Each structure stands twice: as C-alpha cells, then as structure tokens.
Design a protein with these regions (language model features):
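Radical SAM enzyme [4Fe-4S]-AdoMet core and its adjacent flexible, acidic
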Residues: 247-433, 437
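Glycine-rich, histidine-containing beta strand-loop boundary motifs that form or position
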Residues: 109-111, 123-126, 162, 190, ...
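Radical SAM/AdoMet-radical enzyme domain recognition
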Residues: 141-159, 168-289
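Radical SAM enzyme core and accessory elements
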Residues: 1-87, 93-95, 346-512
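Short glycine-enriched, charge-decorated loop/helix-capping segments at active-site entrances
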Residues: 126-134, 227-233, 300-301
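Broad gene-expression machinery/nucleic-acid interaction feature
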Residues: 40, 106, 212, 254, ...
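A short, flexible beta-alpha/helix-coil linker loop
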Residues: 125-130, 220-223, 292-293
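Conserved alpha-helical substructure of the radical SAM core
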Residues: 37-62, 66-190, 194-200, 204, ...
Length: 512
C-alpha cells in the first residue's frame, strides 16, 4: 500500500445532515461520523439535549457504498406534478412537495387500522388506539387514481396494507379496482391468519389480480413470535399459508422479517434455507430491522437496534460464507438499468433513486441439488451496471444505434446458462412479464431499514420511493408518515371504536 493509499484509509468519515428531535419533532442539525469501525450519528436539541445512535454498523462497507452510489447520477427528479406546496419545509409539508427528489415506485394504501392480532412491534398501531381508521371504498379508489396520476411515472406497484387488510371483505374488489386503473403489480401485506383458514377468500384475492403475498414471517421458532407478535401458534399458520398458495396456484410470496437484536438475529440462516426449500412459491425475503415507531418502546431501542450491515454480517456467518458482505449492493443499484432500458426501448421505467443507505439487496440462484449461490458468482454485476450507464449516455446523446449495440456486451458477462437466458428475456423484451419470469427463477434477499425519530435523516427521506397515499389527497414518504404524520392523518378520517362497534355489531378483529 502506498503512503497516499494509507492516508486515504486512515481518513475518518464525517458529514452533516438534518434530523428530528425525538421529543418535540423539531428539526435539528445532525453529525454523521466514524468511530471504531462504526458510523454513528449525534444531534442536539436546544430544549431536550443530545441524542446519539448507530447510523451504520460497518464503516468500511458504508464508505464503499457512499463512494460508489452516493452521487448525482443516482438522484431522481421528483414529481412533475407535486401535490403540496412548501410552507413549513421538509418533512412537515408531505406530500409530495417540490423538495422531494424521487417519485413513487411502490405505493402503499392502508385499508384499515383494524387487525386480528396485537403485535408489540407494529408501526401501524394496529389495535392500540381508540379509533378506527378505515377509508371508504371510494376513498381507496381515489387514492389509487392519485398514485396513477403521478408524473413522469404513473405508479404501477401497489401494496394494500393496514392493520390487517384481509379483514376487509371487499379487498378482492379493491384489488380489481387497482388492476382496472392500470396497476401491474398488486401485493397484500398480511399476517396470513385468514388466508390459512379461508382458502376460498385467498383464491378470491388471486383471481382479482393479486400479484404477490407480502407475508409477515419472523422465523421458524414459536419463541420469536411470542416476543414479536404476542402469540405462540404462528409457525404452523405460516406453513399453512404456503400450502394454500400452492393449492390455488400463487407462486409469488415475500417472507417479511421484522428483525430485532436478541430476538431473531440468529435465525436468518434458517429463514434463507426455508425460502430455498420453498422456492417454488417464495420469491423474496424482505428483512426489516426494527424501527422504533408504533408500539416498540423507547427504552428497548438500544438493545434491539440492528442496522443493515449488521444484518449482512449475520447472514454471512449463518450461511457459512456462501453469501458474503461483498455480494450485496445498495437499493439504488438498478438506476442505470432503468435509464439504459429507457433510452433503448423509448419508454419510462421506474427508477429506484432512493438513498443508498436505505437498504441493500442480493439475489441467490437455487441449483437443482438444493444448493444456492449469490448472483455475483454468475454475473459481474458492477460491470453490468457500468455498461448500462454507457448505453444510457449513448442514447441521450442521440446515438441510439450505438446504445443498442452496447447491449450485446451484457450477456457475455453471465456465466450461468440459466441466468443468461433469463436476463436475455428481460433485456430484449423489457417487459413486466419478462422481469416476472426472471424473479421466479431466483430468490431476492432485501434489507430495508426504515427510519424512526431517533435515526431520522432528511437527506434519506427526501429520496424515498416508497410512499403512502392518504384520503386527504396527499402522498407521503414511508418514514415521515410513520414517524410524524400517521396519527394526525388517520384521526381526520377515523371514528371511535364505540361508534364502529355500534355500527357493525362486531369485534374489531372480525372481518367486515
């Protein structure tokens, strides 16, 4: 190592952003800095004092990602038709306003805050507040239209969430409304209770156009669920949901893991193995390190906090090095692919222009013998992205023929005939269906670390691409909605529990 390289290695990372005081929610300056191989944050409120937290658990990985993917090339352009004006400034004017730098890639609509469970970690406050938020059928249709009217990208991926969305009997009709409005990908975020018990209702969701089931799945030990969900009978229910999915012909399930230190951080390897064993129906594992919103108590934060690189290291250990920390890329890695495909196909593709520290992902390819390897062993993913940047720059310079010729450089980078064939289909057709065929032959593992008031970073939130549509005609970034806006928005459209029970004559947990 040269003296110059050594000096670069010794440089400690430091930058500044804006955060929130966890007590009063006023904006405060935030310092992000490196110490002992970890990236920390610190912020001070004039009234409530100093707060510190872990920002990113691996400084080496952080600096690599920051250098490669935190730059202007990966910035979005926001909405051409913003829904609100700037009055108080970000994050109080959501949304989306002109300060937001990305458009909606995944829209979320909470169809109820009622639930048939009472999970202590739920950020949607299901069953914990004394009101019922349940938008009307027409309000939900209007929210779908709101997302579809976004420009330059009409949101075509939608999640129905809650609460527990499956306790609405009209959910199949709402899915059909989304498909009618032109949404290509519709997923349902669920604990699976009703789908394990009522296969006919499950099939109605599929027949209506549901693309994917977003299944709460914290592990394969009942002790986990006692801590995270307050029940000890859920493992068999998860198995039953997969069994019913096979019976009705659904082959796209995402296992959604709420990850907490000391609870299920030793279970990631077994969850990956379970996904591999069930890869005929499991398409993805989405790991969500716990955020301190909802009913997760403040005094539990320190012992339960776990960051994206902590999760990556645990997976490396628990897969015996099959998936290393260098097999992951930040969630904005696909930007050049969207841009390159756009100039070649002369159409707009969704751009994942979120902040690179919001999450990370990798893909694993399952072999016939049940073994698996990360896609980085089959494809030079960084060269792949570099070629797509070259394709994009050729296209925007008007050299469309050259851009198309550069596409020929992509497939020789792929070692596996299976993966090469799948990618060829995606590259040549550039369709949602081709991408779906690719996703059905691999398993994605994603880690999304949603923010709370303790680790809130304005720089991150302004680049968010996962947005809630709400009945007031606004679209709000995920982390501002759950940290700041949820209660006030829901209360505008809520009725009291007593009013609801008098109107319907049922328990809050019962389907209506």
């Amino acid at each position: 190592m040269s003296k110059l390289q050594q000096r670069e290695e010794e440089v400690k990372f430091e930058s500044y952003s804006t955060s929130l005081c966890p007590e009063c929610l006023n904006k405060v300056p935030m310092r992000i800095y490196e110490e002992n191989g970890v990236i920390y944050l610190e912020k001070t409120c004039p009234e409530h004092g100093k707060f510190e937290d872990v920002y990113w658990g691996d400084a080496e990985l952080f600096k690599w990602i920051y250098k490669e993917w935190y730059n202007a090339k990966y910035l979005g352009n926001g909405l051409e038709n913003p829904h609100t004006k700037i009055v108080k400034g970000c994050p109080y004017d959501c949304g989306l306003c002109t300060q937001h730098k990305s458009y909606t890639v995944l829209g979320i609509i909470d169809v109820t805050n009622r639930c048939n469970m009472a999970c202590p970690v739920c950020f949607a406050y299901a069953g914990a507040v004394n009101y019922v938020y349940e938008p009307t059928y027409q309000q939900i249709v209007d929210m779908i239209k709101l997302l579809r009217n976004n420009k330059p990208w009409a949101c075509n991926a939608l999640q129905f969430s809650g609460g527990e969305p499956t306790i609405r009997n009209d959910l199949p009709q709402l899915i059909a409304e989304a498909k009618k409005a032109g949404v290509e990908h519709v997923e349902v975020n669920t604990n699976g209770l009703r789908l394990a018990e009522d296969i006919d209702y499950f099939k109605k969701l599929l027949d209506a156009g549901m693309s994917t089931l977003y299944l709460q799945f914290d592990g394969l030990r009942e002790e986990i669920y006692k801590k995270t969900r307050g029940r000890t009978d859920l493992v068999q229910i998860k198995h039953k949901v997969l069994e019913n999915a096979r019976k009705i012909g659904l082959d796209s399930i995402v296992l959604v893991v709420t990850l907490a230190r000391g609870v299920n951080d030793k279970d990631l390897g077994s969850i990956i193995r379970y996904a591999v064993e069930n890869h005929d129906v499991v398409r993805c594992i989405n790991i969500q390190p716990i955020s301190m919103a909802g009913r997760a108590r403040k005094d539990e934060m320190r012992k339960m906090r776990i960051t994206v690189p902590d999760t990556i290291k645990l997976i490396e250990e628990q897969t015996n090095g099959i998936i290393t920390r260098w097999d992951w890329r930040p969630v904005n890695w696909p930007v050049p692919i969207s841009k390159g495909m756009g100039v070649v196909k002369n159409r707009v593709y969704p751009e994942f222009t979120m902040h690179p520290m919001c999450g990370a992902a990798t893909f694993i390819v399952v072999e016939k013998d049940g073994s698996y390897k990360p896609i980085t062993q089959y494809v030079d993913v960084d060269r792949f992205a570099e070629i797509f940047w070259n394709i994009y720059y050729s296209g925007v310079k008007g050299k469309k023929t050259m851009a198309k010729m550069k596409m020929l450089e992509l497939l020789p980078l792929v070692k596996s005939p299976l993966v090469r064939g799948l990618l060829k289909d995606v590259i040549t057709k550039g369709s949602y269906e081709a991408l779906g065929r690719f996703m059905r032959k691999i398993i994605m593992i994603g880690i999304m670390h949603f923010m709370d008031v303790w680790n809130f970073d304005l720089d991150r939130v302004q680049r968010c691409v996962i947005h809630y549509a709400t009945p007031d005609g606004k679209v709000r970034p995920f982390c501002t909605y759950n940290s700041i806006h949820r209660n006030s928005v829901e209360k505008q459209f809520a009725i009291s529990v007593s009013e609801w029970t008098e109107k319907f004559g049922k328990k809050l947990s019962e389907p209506v």
